Regions:
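Carbohydrate-active catalytic/glycan-binding domains of CAZyme proteins
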Residues: 1-327
Length: 327
């Protein structure tokens, strides 16, 4: 069996949740895990806020684990705020790589700014790629300006001292709409991780069944490449699909069924959305980290009022396990 057909063993409960955390900064939204393992320690960076949904406000937190399944939130969270960004007001979709050659954590992320109408609805936003480095994953030196003008959810692989590849959502045109951004995944190349060249054509595009293709994550193994990404499908559901490639350039899309579906169960934390996949190759197993939406629409906002979000709320992070022997 190929990795894109892996049988994932998911937990009944999230590993982190805005509904159960004791930390005050992420009690409304909790979103987009990115995980690395260095030695015997697993580190997870993730996003959160305690104001309300649909706002360009999101900070960055850190959690650690010794087994990849049970996590402890860092006491100094959030470790980075919107005020630490050189552009915009919200952290979005980080991706962290530990560079073993330089003994350095490197993070690519999106910086978001938004504009609302008179009813408080987000009607326009700009999303630009940023970069930061850290010796320990806690204290970060943020690059002082955006490094690419259009993006969402970068995923970076380092092939050598001067060879980086990235897959990221990007708008085909400089003035493209948000729907264009989340409907196209491109491949990029760089010699330093800062200056990026985008391929002329996207490698994955939205279609009639998958109305978006967003949050790409790529794993390379002996058989080639597997890319996971999230998609809006019928029924108000968002699920993780896959494509595979032998060279990272030409992809075969496996859209007949999701690689990691929402359960559709109204009682499950991941009943409505499975999103922002992050797959860790961890010895004799793979770990799939993801954020999730349940079917609830109500939440308590930061001002104490009860608010309604018709699309649900990103408020859980889950993990699923697949032993390599089962693939």
């Amino acid at each position: 069996m190929s990795l894109h057909r892996a049988h994932w063993q998911r937990s009944d409960q999230p590993i982190l949740s805005a509904m159960t955390t004791d930390q005050a900064w992420c009690q409304v939204q909790l979103y987009n895990p990115t995980v690395v393992r260095v030695g015997c320690t697993y580190k997870m960076w993730y996003l959160g806020n305690s104001s309300e949904t649909r706002r360009p406000e999101m900070n960055l937190g850190l959690a650690e684990s010794t087994d990849g399944v049970h996590w402890t939130e860092h006491s100094d969270n959030p470790i980075l705020h919107g005020s630490d960004l050189p552009f915009g007001s919200a952290w979005q979709t980080p991706h962290v790589l530990f560079d073993v050659d330089e003994n350095l954590y490197k993070m690519w992320f999106i910086m978001l700014t938004g504009r609302k109408d008179g009813q408080g609805r987000l009607v326009d936003m700009a999303q630009k790629l940023g970069y930061a480095v850290s010796p320990d994953g806690l204290q970060w030196d943020v690059h002082p300006e955006p490094i690419y003008p259009s993006g969402r959810r970068p995923c970076v692989i380092k092939d050598g001292p001067k060879a980086y590849r990235m897959w990221m959502n990007s708008s085909p045109t400089p003035d493209g709409a948000f729907e264009d951004l989340v409907g196209n995944i491109y491949r990029f190349e760089s010699t330093d991780g800062l200056s990026w060249t985008r391929d002329p054509q996207p490698v994955v595009t939205a279609n009639e069944k998958l109305r978006s293709v967003v949050y790409p994550f790529v794993v390379e193994d002996e058989s080639g490449y597997t890319m996971w990404y999230g998609s809006h499908v019928d029924g108000g559901v968002f699920e993780i699909f896959c494509s595979t490639s032998t060279d990272g350039l030409t992809w075969t899309h496996h859209h007949d069924e999701p690689a990691f579906p929402a359960t559709r169960n109204p009682n499950d934390f991941d009943g409505r959305y499975t999103s922002t996949p992050c797959v860790l190759d961890d010895g004799d197993r793979y770990l799939l980290y993801y954020c999730a939406r349940d079917w609830g629409n109500l939440y308590r906002a930061g001002d104490g009022t009860i608010k309604f979000d018709g699309a649900g709320v990103y408020r859980h992070i889950g993990v699923a396990v697949c032993p390599k022997a089962a693939i």
